[in-house]
């Protein structure tokens, strides 16, 4: 989860690099070597007071964990801000804005996770990652990411932010991702709305990499119809 400098900034969820003329995303998406978490005794019960004190280690005077606090928090737990585990954590905290945790979000979410210190959260990393392997949970995380990443004064995601979030969520698992990633560069699309966003996930799950089972009469958004048409032309050229 990238650290935003302003609440209104869309942020970027993945670093992108040139490779052989095609843009490939370099994302620390599912794992990164973290310092081993200290084993927590089963007798150390969750403490709301301790959780609140932990929050104030990172919060500013406005009682919000902002960019600087988020950077320190990520350093302490041993996770890069753009690691997908931060998106899953934000989902668990029901955070509204990328790069920010309010006190209410922190206390509600960490209470749900029963985490009141760094070590307990590190011991939850495997659980957080497991949410990505559950079809229902992943769908919820994917849908959450749209509102989480968009500017709150906009109804759609700008296309660069959409591409970065798609890279984070689908870059490792969708065979057509690298092709779809290139498509907006030569298309008319500069934003992605919620319906398009939702349907990209369904498309990635339902349609074969060779597009052989794509139903032109299906209820897909025009964006995906045009993507398929564009890709078929490329395949035959």
Curated annotation (Swiss-Prot):
The record's account of how the chain is modified after translation: Phosphorylation at Ser-41 is independent of cullin's interaction. Phosphorylated in response to both TICAM1 and MYD88 dependent Toll-like receptor (TLR) pathway activation. Phosphorylated in response to IL1B stimulation.
Localisation per UniProt entry: Nucleus; Cytoplasm, Cytoskeleton, Spindle
Superkingdom of origin organism: Eukaryota
GO biological process: DNA damage response; positive regulation of protein neddylation; protein neddylation; regulation of cell growth; regulation of protein neddylation
GO MF entry, a single one: ubiquitin conjugating enzyme binding
Cited function: Contributes to the neddylation of all cullins by transferring NEDD8 from N-terminally acetylated NEDD8-conjugating E2s enzyme to different cullin C-terminal domain-RBX complexes which is necessary for the activation of cullin-RING E3 ubiquitin ligases (CRLs). May play a role in DNA damage response and may participate in cell proliferation and anchorage-independent cell growth.
Domain notes: The DCUN1 domain, also known as PONY domain, mediates the interaction with different cullins. The DCUN1 domain mediates the interaction with the N-terminally acetylated NEDD8-conjugating E2s enzyme leading to the NEDD8 transfer from N-terminally acetylated NEDD8-conjugating E2s enzyme to different cullin C-terminal domain-RBX complexes; the neddylation efficiency correlates with the DCUN1D5-cullin and DCUN1D5-E2 interaction affinities.
Protein name, per record: DCN1-like protein 5
């Amino acid at each position: 989860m990238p650290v935003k400098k302003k609440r209104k900034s869309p942020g970027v969820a993945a670093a992108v690099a040139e490779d052989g003329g095609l843009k490939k995303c370099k994302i620390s998406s599912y794992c990164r070597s973290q310092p081993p978490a200290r084993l927590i005794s089963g007798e150390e019960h969750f403490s709301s007071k301790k959780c609140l004190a932990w929050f104030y280690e990172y919060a500013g005077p406005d009682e919000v964990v902002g960019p600087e606090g988020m950077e320190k928090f990520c350093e302490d737990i041993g996770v890069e801000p753009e690691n997908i585990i931060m998106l899953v954590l934000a989902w668990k905290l029901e955070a509204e804005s990328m790069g920010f945790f309010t006190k209410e979000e922190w206390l509600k979410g960490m209470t749900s996770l029963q985490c009141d210190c760094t070590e307990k959260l590190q011991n939850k990393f495997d659980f957080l990652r497991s949410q990505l392997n559950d079809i229902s949970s992943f769908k919820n995380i994917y849908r959450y990411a749209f509102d989480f990443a968009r500017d709150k004064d906009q109804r759609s995601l700008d296309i660069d932010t959409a591409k970065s979030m798609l890279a984070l969520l689908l870059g490792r698992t969708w065979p057509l991702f690298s092709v779809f990633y290139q498509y907006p560069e030569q298309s008319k699309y500069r934003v992605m709305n919620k319906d398009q966003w939702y349907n990209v996930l369904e498309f990635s799950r339902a349609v074969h990499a060779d597009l052989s089972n794509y139903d032109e009469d299906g209820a897909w958004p025009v964006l995906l119809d045009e993507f398929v048409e564009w890709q078929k032309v490329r395949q035959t050229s």
